[in-house]
């Protein structure tokens, strides 16, 4: 999964050369393509799935890796669902929320990689006492600007409350490592 993540990050840096009028198009080594969005402070890829939807029988199960389709282009221009929480009163909340957002600065280009300079990557995990919040609330563009536009910011949505941090003997029987829904693995 980490190789896929870093491949995606590298391809995002290359994306400024492709599809400038419609936003960046990234093609990973495994054939998966993501259509991003160009904004005033850089490029963004939003609502990228990193785990299978934890609905139904997977509700309290440890997260499972997601295998994206390799045909077609995945729209990564819109924010995904927020994980259920007490403050959710709109239709933007869903258990299908294991999503992340990736932002690159306008100075994060292929030239930086070609010259052997690695770009900094900041992974922002929101707070909220494991009960509330979302990576969608934090725009990555301003955070990238703190790196002079030469970096990458990742924000993440993760299961909250009992759906993400419930512990019990029944769950321990399924996954003795954590005895919970295993958000700690993500």
Annotated model-derived regions:
Residues 14-179:
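Non-catalytic accessory segments of hydrolases
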Residues 1-12:
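Classical eukaryotic N-terminal signal peptides for Sec-dependent ER targeting/secretion
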Residues 183-186:
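Extended, hydrophobic alpha-helical segments in both membrane/secreted and soluble proteins
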